[in-house]
Every structure is written in C-alpha cells, then in structure tokens.
Amino acid sequence: AGPYSFGL
C-alpha cells in the first residue's frame, strides 16, 4: 500500500 492505490 502507498500514496496511490495499486495492487500493492
């Protein structure tokens, strides 16, 4: 997870 919503 991070500042953007990808599949991370």
Swiss-Prot record:
Localisation: Secreted
UniProt keyword list: Amidation, Neuropeptide, Secreted
One Gene Ontology term, aspect cellular component: extracellular region
Keyword check for Transferase: no
Similarity comment text for this entry: Belongs to the allatostatin family.
Known function: May act as a neurotransmitter or neuromodulator.
Record-given protein name: Carcinustatin-15
Source organism of this protein record: Carcinus maenas (Common shore crab)
Lineage of producing organism: Eukaryota, Metazoa, Ecdysozoa, Arthropoda, Crustacea
